[in-house]
Amino acid sequence: MPLDPIAYKPYADPDDFIREVTDLIWVDRAIGHIYENYEPDAIVHGSYGTSVGVEEVVQGSLMRISATPDRVGQAEDVVWEARGEDAFLSSHLVLSVDQSTDFISRTIANCLYRRGRMVEEWVVRDSLAICQQLGQDPDEVARVKPFIGYSGSMTEPAPQNVLAVGDSGERPDEYRAEAQMVLEFIDRVWNRRDLNAVEHYWIRDLVLHTIGYRTFTRPEGYRRALLKMLQPFPGGRFEVRDVQTHYAVRYAGLRVAVTWVYKGDYNGADDFGPLTGTPVEILGVSQFLVQDGRLVREVRVYDEIAVRSQIHNRRGDSTYASTNIY
């Protein structure tokens, strides 16, 4: 079923819509356009929780632009997929470069647009990269960031059949085999910890771009990056909240975007200070490039500063002792 142009007009297509609207607001400083672009009661799920209403988006955008006026965010990818006849879900990978401070980082904004208006958004930023490049202490930054918590769809159980219906609604049955392969990989390698199976899904010369603006190559590099992410929360599990696919020559072929939440307890490696045993929720988005039935590249974005914020804000006076004696 073709997408009605009312979903993205006056632009050429959803890709053009996302690129141009983003530039209009963030580069040309048309912050007031947000009132036209977002519904008044738009829902935004970020790394620190859920906010409702366009005013917080306007105010937050103004503060970010003012704090980093030389930063330019440029689209590396736009993975979009229809949601009915008049709506689409886009996964917008943004590469931000600030010429005055020389920091570089990535953001992924997954946006549900209906008739050209933002209804719901899931946005994650690599704040760790900025902290490290600017010489800031990640823990000090985290301590002044409030974790509000999630509401709305994020408090409901993860969709049972995300290939049919995700948090953004019913999706078209496109590229089922490739999307199913990505979900199988997440379940087998990420959740069941079968790290030996990386080669089953990936090419040898794989590339992983992840937080801290770090890049890993080859299966062993991928395994070590995943282990590093999981070791503070070894009993946690990934929940897949949404999936979208899109094929475009411009972006090297088929990409599969996955919105996920990792839920665990800080009872493993003490990477973020003394253990607390308290729960953490990590909202993340991964964009996978698939070529010839194999995974080639992943861009994985989540906010480690928000993770540290949850741990710091939930830290009590008593000392937590791990019960794992293996």
Language-model features: locations:
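C-terminal and inter-domain tail/linker signature
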Residues: 1-326
